[in-house]
Amino acid sequence: MKSNQERSNECLPPKKREIPATSRPSEEKATALPSDNHCVEGVAWLPSTPGSRGHGGGRHGPAGTSGEHGLQGMGLHKALSAGLDYSPPSAPRSVPTANTLPTVYPPPQSGTPVSPVQYAHLSHTFQFIGSSQYSGPYAGFIPSQLISPPGNPVTSAVASAAGATTPSQRSQLEAYSTLLANMGSLSQAPGHKVEPPPQQHLGRAAGLVNPGSPPPTQQNQYIHISSSPQSSGRATSPPIPVHLHPHQTMIPHTLTLGPSSQVVVQYSDAGGHFVPRESTKKAESSRLQQAMQAKEVLNGEMEKSRRYGASSSVELSLGKTSSKSVPHPYESRHVVVHPSPADYSSRDTSGVRGSVMVLPNSSTPSADLETQQATHREASPSTLNDKSGLHLGKPGHRSYALSPHTVIQTTHSASEPLPVGLPATAFYAGAQPPVIGYLSSQQQAITYAGGLPQHLVIPGTQPLLIPVGSPDMDTPGAASAIVTSSPQFAAVPHTFVTTALPKSENFNPEALVTQAAYPAMVQAQIHLPVVQSVASPAAASPTLPPYFMKGSIIQLANGELKKVEDLKTEDFIQSAEISNDLKIDSSTVERIEDSHSPGVAVIQFAVGEHRAQVSVEVLVEYPFFVFGQGWSSCCPERTSQLFDLPCSKLSVGDVCISLTLKNLKNGSVKKGQPVDPASALLKHAKTDSLAGSRHRYAEQENGINQGSAQVLSENGELKFPEKIGLPAAPFLTKIEPSKPTATRKRRWSAPETRKLEKSEDEPPLTLPKPSLIPQEVKICIEGRSNVGK
């Protein structure tokens, strides 16, 4: 055994080593495992041993192939006696590199000047963690310490990482990563027990780091893995929602690691720039203990989200790019572990939650994305040894189509509920814009809608809820689910959401590629379908606002509270007299006809003193307040059935009354709207000083529009006539040449004498519009009751 001093000296860069260069190779070979002699064979390592995927032994067992055996011996059974000394080609080297293991890692690229790899002794506690302060050889490799190396010595990931490309394209960085993966598995911080998780992929595809390739425009990818500080022996891994964020600087580079609830894997493009190892040595050692702790916490957690840019099977990785390197959305990367105690752990009831933030490289070609998409799948337990996919500890699949503008797709087990609707701050440590998407298949803990088992939430001032499937959905084809209309979609033009399998069952990875949605995701040119209006769904099943419901409380202008069914004509008149802002508008029913649509009637009103003719389509059950008679509707039976509101039959000659604002401008109401005081109130309510009345009015407008999709909105305003005030939302107003008259009607605000006459068509719904208590009375008349609600 070497002395501690010798070992520490060997860990130093060549320039600072005190050991004679000639003594190192023989001594090092002497101390290496008997299988070390096989390392020479590791040159051909993975390219020549595609079948070694499932044979590589873990840190606790013998190796299957000689090349892997040699690595195993170096990394598992001795104190990291073999390490890579990576320094720029121009840096002088005090130790002859060719004498150590000349055939193991010769410079693979003849055209690119890269320094050869040599071994250096590293301490047991050495743990490699990429840091933002350095790039190059240490960039882009997640140490097996964090990865929780599998029971088999050498993962197929290592094979694919180093052997996927031909020697002409494989950089020393790749060779370094493969060796590092094995070396990292041997060192464990004392006191931390680590149980070997299921086999996992190194997460690095062939040609990922090509020194000669230009860095992508978007260089940072973030994988945010959230887990609770539980033992590493967790039987099953939690589901992983995926979050996509377009910003590179979302996560700070300098973060500390510890047994926290969150781990962030940050990928930074090194651009093939290599720096001397000594400049990064201290940073690595300082993070060693933290990395060890993270491993215990994460164990299998990180593995499941680290399958990016890697082929699902070794053959696929080894077989492709034999003559050319494949561009990837992820170039050389840095690993940063970031604890966020305030993250999921505080919100998750189940204790362990995994989340993934992915920042795709916008420069990645769609062809490569297709390859990744086809290969980024989780292998089922039966194929775990054959495919180097990630395994969540339970059957299922997760596919990442990481195109430049693509929102993720993920699978969650129904047995592990995942909270929905969490704010963007739950996932991001910095004050960055909200995540683009949050996908969950949770069926219970849904705060937005109890019936949505799986949906996409786009956080923002008004969170956007996008249903993306149902619990029994077997295919991600339902990705193009209905999306609630929201202006936020303007900011997410290139987003395509695909649903995932919520079931806990084996998923055939091949089925994914066949789905039509996936090619679309790869292209990243698909826009989320946006429903034209929230009222559209309502159109199918129109419903009236609840204020017409019997028992709803209406507040009159004088402050008196009355039930909607107890309103009298005097209440309207008194409210108009007491209030300086309200007046009674009347509309006379001139004609009632059946509409071509079932359950809809066409009513023609003569509005105001000018008798402006307005035709309105209204639901037959919509109640109007008739002067001297009370509530009336075209179909009293339906009204009584729906609202339990006693109604009379609306007939020609009836004068419908409603309270409207006196100060409404002539042009404030649109075509046909002037006739409807309710619509006038609605418009005014928007600008009215009274929040309560405004709220009621808004409710009326929304309820009407949504309840009966028949109402058309023009420039955001309801088209139904004012007289119908209450029914306005349910009606579709057909404006006749009497528009000017309608405008005049607004001018009527002065003539209070006609209040009774005008009251024909104006429903009490207009009342809620006014901000004053009289407006509330109006609401009462219209049937809209805040108190009732």
Curated annotation (Swiss-Prot):
Modified residues (Phosphothreonine): T217
Basic and acidic residues bias locations: 1-30
Ranges annotated as biased composition (Polar residues): 218-235, 310-325, 360-386
UniProt name for this protein: Ataxin-1
A GO cellular component annotation in the UniProt record: postsynapse
Region annotation Disordered: where it falls in the sequence: 1-73, 188-237, 296-397, 736-772
Domain notes: The AXH domain is required for interaction with CIC.
Assembly, per entry: Homooligomer. Interacts with CIC. Interacts with ANP32A, PQBP1, UBQLN4, ATXN1L and USP7. Directly interacts with RBPJ; this interaction is disrupted in the presence of Notch intracellular domain. Competes with ATXN1L for RBPJ-binding. Found in a complex with CIC and ATXN1L.
Similarity field: Belongs to the ATXN1 family.
Role summary: Chromatin-binding factor that repress Notch signaling in the absence of Notch intracellular domain by acting as a CBF1 corepressor. Binds to the HEY promoter and might assist, along with NCOR2, RBPJ-mediated repression. Binds RNA in vitro. May be involved in RNA metabolism. In concert with CIC and ATXN1L, involved brain development.
Motif Nuclear localization signal: chain residues: 768-771
Disulfide topology: none
Subcellular location: Cytoplasm; Nucleus
Modified residue annotations for Phosphoserine: S81, S87, S213, S228, S749
An annotated Gene Ontology molecular function: chromatin binding
Region Interaction with USP7: start-end pairs: 512-789
Residues annotated as domain AXH: 536-667
Residue stretches in coiled coil: none
Gene name tied to this protein: Atxn1
Annotated region (RNA-binding), positions in chain: 514-740
Post-translational modification: Ubiquitinated by UBE3A, leading to its degradation by the proteasome. Phosphorylation at Ser-749 increases the pathogenicity of proteins with an expanded polyglutamine tract.
Organism: Rattus norvegicus (Rat)
Crosslink position(s): Glycyl lysine isopeptide (Lys-Gly) (interchain with G-Cter in SUMO): K16, K193, K583, K670, K719
Keyword Membrane: no
